[in-house]
């Protein structure tokens, strides 16, 4: 298929460039002794997740859907945050998250 035959809009991901950037991030991770957390807000292109999974060991989730996506596609630790937790959702977040951030002590 020629590029002008592909329906638009579309995204082109150059795997070599993605890997080069992930290698740089991985180097920073090693040299600084930190953990890199992938944010779905920065990249929601789920077809890249198998590659990202090779480099990132954690991800963020600002919703239950993002938490489930992280668990299903990345299978790593999930750092969750939410503007408001309900009695129902807090238990779901507790079951699927490795870390939970609260906006205030009152939210606890």
Question: Model-predicted segments: where are they?
Answer:
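Generic signature of intrinsically disordered, low-complexity segments enriched in small/polar residues
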Residues: 13-14, 88
């Amino acid at each position: 298929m020629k590029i002008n035959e592909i329906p638009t809009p579309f995204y082109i991901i150059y795997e070599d460039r993605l890997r080069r950037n992930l290698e740089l991030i991985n180097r920073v991770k090693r040299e600084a002794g930190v953990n890199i957390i992938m944010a779905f807000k920065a990249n929601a292109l789920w077809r890249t997740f198998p590659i990202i999974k090779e480099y990132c060991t954690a991800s963020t989730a600002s919703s239950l859907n993002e938490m489930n996506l992280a668990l299903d596609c990345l299978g790593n630790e999930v750092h969750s945050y939410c503007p408001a937790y309900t009695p129902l959702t807090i238990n779901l977040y507790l079951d699927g998250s490795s870390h939970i951030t609260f906006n205030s002590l009152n939210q606890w």
